Swiss-Prot record:
GO cellular component, one term: chloroplast stroma
Gene name as annotated: TGD3
Function: ATPase transporter involved in lipid transfer from the endoplasmic reticulum (ER) to plastids, and necessary for thylakoids formation. Not involved in transition metal transport pathways.
Family, per entry: Belongs to the ABC transporter superfamily. ABCI family.
UniProt binding sites for ATP: 117-124
Entry-linked CDD domains: ABC_Org_Solvent_Resistant
UniProt-recorded name of the protein: Protein TRIGALACTOSYLDIACYLGLYCEROL 3, chloroplastic
Complex and partners: Catalytic subunit of the TGD complex, a lipid translocator at the inner chloroplast envelope membrane made of TGD1, TGD2 and TGD3. Interacts with TGD1 and TGD2 with an overall subunit stoichiometry of 2 TGD1, 2 TGD3 and 8 to 12 TGD2. Interacts with TGD5.
Annotated compartments: Plastid, Chloroplast stroma
Record key words, sorted: ATP-binding, Chloroplast, Lipid transport, Nucleotide-binding, Plastid, Transit peptide, Transport
Pfam families membership: ABC_tran
Highest classification ranks of the organism: Eukaryota, Viridiplantae, Streptophyta, Embryophyta, Tracheophyta
Example of a GO biological process term: lipid transport
Targeting presequence: 1-46
Length: 345
């Protein structure tokens, strides 16, 4: 889990030798042994909070639109005080390939949102832009009403943390499960090693893993690695008096898993958020989460509201129960898996 704080600047938790592009230069982070790590971007872990069960009488969104803004407007909600993240008319290209073409939407407090659509339509790209790993070529990203320019380290925005769980678990191969889950606490907190070790054990138990603390990632199955990454997203410094709310972004959390393992991960995502408390039973910080997925089971089990990305635009949005009954031809084809329709490969 890569958890990025909007409140200050330090290093991100990235796999060894992974490069990311800033707005003006390319930076490279190489992760050596734990004691030698240099932080440039603040990375933080915390408990993620429950989604909101939205109304069953939500307005249907069956017409094609150029942007994704407006779900709450359609429902008559004019107050934006509960908006945590907003993307306004976001564009992004890589070379000659235009990935995002004017994407707009809002993530509100307490929501569980799914981003779906065919491969190559910009789902992971918009996730990285929201997390601050990529800067949009055009358009704006607002964090709790404050405009963020460029990458997350370009300016300080307090009041919200944004976590990103990569499609791969992004665990450090040379570190044990205990060291992976408690990584930031060992490096950045004032907690003792015994305190961290106990908290890691409790957090792993909360995601259904016991007795794996001393194992290496290579000794775990794919599903277990996903759960370790989830545990890393839930753990936080319990000695702090104030913990800011967090929005957690999942990039295909069930990719590569069998149906049963997928169900375990989906239910963990939902149940951990629904408890409204952290791994050790203390009150949690209610926020929101967003899941990028291709899996129908994830759509049905883990999210309440859907955004459909196609050719770089949000062409449909609605509630989960509307997905299979939509008259939108693009959504119909995606829902049924038919080869006949607008989506071509």
């Amino acid at each position: 889990m890569l958890s990025l704080s909007c409140s200050s600047s330090s290093s991100s938790l990235l796999p060894p030798s992974l490069h990311y592009h800033g707005s003006s230069s390319v930076q490279s982070i190489v992760v050596p042994r734990r004691s030698l790590i240099s932080f440039r971007r603040k990375v933080s872990c915390c408990c993620i909070a429950p989604p909101q069960n939205l109304d069953n009488d939500a307005t249907k969104f069956d017409s094609l639109t150029k942007s994704g803004g407006g779900m709450c407007k359609e429902r008559g909600l004019e107050n934006d005080s509960d908006v945590l993240i907003e993307c306004r008319d976001v564009y992004k290209s890589f070379g000659e390939k235009h990935i995002l073409k004017g994407v707009s939407f809002k993530i509100r407090h307490g929501e569980a949102v799914g981003v779906i659509g065919p491969s190559g339509t910009g789902k992971s790209t918009i996730l990285k832009i929201m997390a601050g790993l990529l800067a949009p070529d055009k358009g704006e990203v607002y964090i709790r009403g404050k405009k963020r320019a460029g990458l997350i380290s370009d300016e300080e925005i307090s009041g919200l943390r944004i976590g990103l769980v990569f499609q791969s678990a992004a665990l450090f191969d040379s570190l044990s499960v205990r060291e992976n889950v408690g990584f930031l606490l060992y490096e950045r907190s004032k907690m003792s090693e015994n305190q961290i070790s106990e908290l890691v054990t409790q957090t792993l138990a909360a995601v259904g893993l016991k007795g794996v603390e001393n194992r290496l990632p290579s000794e775990l199955s794919g599903g277990m690695k996903k759960r370790v990454a989830l545990a890393r997203s839930l753990i936080f410094d319990t000695t702090k008096e104030v913990i800011e709310p967090e929005v957690l972004l999942y990039d295909e959390p069930t990719a590569g898993l069998d149906p049963i393992a997928s169900t375990v991960v989906e239910d963990l995502i939902r149940s951990v958020h629904m408890t409204d408390e952290d791994a050790v039973g203390k009150p949690g910080k209610i926020a929101s989460y967003l899941v990028v997925t291709h899996q129908h089971s994830t759509i049905q089990r883990a999210v309440d509201r859907l955004l459909f990305l196609y050719e770089g635009k949000i062409v449909w949005q609605g509630m989960t129960h509307e997905f299979t009954t939509s008259t939108n031809p693009i959504v119909q084809q995606f829902a049924t898996g038919s080869l006949d329709g607008p989506i071509r490969y």
